[in-house]
């Protein structure tokens, strides 16, 4: 469709009402109930030891709304004795929630034309921002934004660990680095980095980064800081053996 996420969501809401289609965006409370179970799984995998931070990318802000709710419920049920801090990371070209956080008061000012290669968080008018704001504040957390270069480099380093994620997920690691450099996250603290999307959502991004062809919105060239450039080889076993040796 020739529209961005926010425009498409507005259209879907109209069609859902008109055609009786079930809307499963994060404005739907059942979506939040499902997403909060991610925190129960996380705690179970950590043997119910609470991390100091849970860091995740922020687009429509359903995940952070759900995570906060799930963690509060776990604490109320006596499963944990404290809440981890929630940190939301946005791409700088689509960062209305970060801007709201920096202002400290008032409502969210939508970004009309959000721009970022991290397509999963290319959202200018997140519907779940009131819930998200409550959960981040309640946890004592924070909101940060990162550049396209920071996202690209973080994605490459995640890939070096054998984990395939799409660009929006890499914003998490980029944000952790930034918050650690600023002293917001202490180097001795336990941090859970949530990667929300598989590499197959945006596989062309990898090739363009490693071949030096990746450009940010506006034509700004992304440097292949951790590039692993593909080598084109002939159909010749001797040549291939030579390269492998």
Identify the residue ranges that each predicted region occupies.
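Glycine-rich ThDP/TPP pyrophosphate-binding loop and its adjacent helix/strand module
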Residues: 36, 42, 47-69, 76
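Short glycine/serine/threonine-rich phosphate/pyrophosphate-binding segments
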Residues: 60-67, 96-97, 170-176
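Short glycine/threonine-rich catalytic loop with a Thr-x-Gly-x-Asp
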Residues: 58-62, 128, 163-169
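Active-site/ligand-binding loops adjacent to catalytic centers
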Residues: 3-23, 30, 72-83, 87-165, ...
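A glycine-rich, Thr/Ser-enriched phosphate-binding loop motif common to dinucleotide/cofactor-binding enzymes
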Residues: 25-39, 166-170
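Claisen-condensing/thiolase-fold acyl-transfer catalytic domains that form or cleave C-C bonds
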Residues: 148-204
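Beta-strand segments within the central parallel beta-sheet cores of soluble alpha/beta enzyme folds
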Residues: 52-56, 81-90, 188-194
């Amino acid at each position: 469709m020739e529209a961005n996420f926010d425009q498409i969501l507005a259209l879907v809401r109209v069609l859902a009402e008109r055609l009786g289609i079930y809307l499963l965006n994060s404005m739907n409370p059942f979506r939040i109930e499902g997403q909060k179970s991610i925190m129960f799984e996380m705690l179970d995998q950590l043997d119910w030891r609470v991390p100091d931070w849970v860091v995740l990318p922020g687009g429509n802000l359903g995940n952070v709304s759900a995570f906060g709710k799930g963690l509060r419920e776990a604490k109320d049920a006596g499963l944990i004795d404290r809440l981890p801090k929630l940190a939301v990371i946005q791409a700088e070209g689509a960062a209305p929630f970060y801007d709201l956080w920096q202002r400290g008061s008032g409502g969210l000012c939508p970004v009309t034309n959000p721009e970022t290669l991290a397509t999963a968080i290319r959202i200018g008018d997140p519907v779940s921002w009131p819930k998200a704001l409550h959960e981040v504040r309640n946890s004592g957390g924070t909101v940060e934004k990162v550049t396209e270069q920071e996202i690209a480099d973080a994605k490459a380093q995640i890939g070096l660990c054998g984990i395939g994620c799409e660009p929006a997920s890499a914003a998490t690691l980029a944000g952790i680095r930034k918050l650690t450099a600023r002293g917001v996250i202490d180097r001795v603290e336990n941090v859970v980095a949530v990667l929300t999307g598989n590499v197959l959502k945006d596989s062309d991004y990898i090739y363009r980064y490693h071949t030096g062809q990746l450009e940010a919105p506006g034509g700004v060239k992304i440097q292949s800081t951790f590039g692993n450039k593909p080598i084109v080889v002939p159909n010749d076993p001797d040549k291939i053996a030579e390269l492998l040796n």
